[in-house]
């Protein structure tokens, strides 16, 4: 069964949840086994469940024993439901089924997204059994900027601002129907993003967009776009070099980047380190 975690019981169970979060076979995404995020990061984010609208932590119990911890958040205006942690010591299949039933009852009409390490075989099998669609499989790569040396940059790569944003929108808009971070949403929050495009014959031949997190020590590349989705290895590497150099100068400490099979070798060549494989599932409630 699932029951709401009350604020006064947070300290009683958070250590248990964190230990599970370090084990990719027992937890979901975001992972805390990447060598970047800390125990303090986990505790701070999980505690926010008691101060943010649309968030709640559920304890998963079997025979009176707490075996799991699920922290979800709901964005009603976007009909979006996701989790910040999905940690289960035993009974992952049952936990997934019960959370699915809970979500259907409370958030009908929303899209539920659940991300897990590919190493969490029980979770992946349970999601498939519940009729979820796998919408992404990728490599989870990290960059430690202490180990990164700036590289020569191409003059064909330029930064994007509000003034020249249309160059980026021209290429990114082809994906607007398939992702949360549409061109308009990125523009609305542009101060928290680093965006670059590769210009060829006056047009964008590729674009990269990285989100800077609030403490400005960590970022994530959310995507690299190409016209008609046709991959160009040279453009990809030049865009990566530009954003890596930029964030090195800014003082960013770590970067996360999820890559597909086609681009993984180029990401590794630019200095990223792979910590595991990620799978994302989606289901309409």
Report residues per predicted region:
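Compact recognition or signaling/catalytic modules
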Residues: 200-285
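Conserved donor-binding loop and adjoining core beta-sheet/short helix segment
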Residues: 28-98, 200, 204-233
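Short amphipathic alpha-helix that is part of the acyltransferase structural core
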Residues: 1-41, 138, 148-180
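Gram-positive cell-envelope targeting signals
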Residues: 5, 13-18, 99-100, 115-117, ...
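Acyl-donor-binding surface of acyltransferase catalytic domains
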Residues: 89-153, 239, 254-285
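A mid-sequence, solvent-exposed acidic-amphipathic segment
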Residues: 172-209, 214
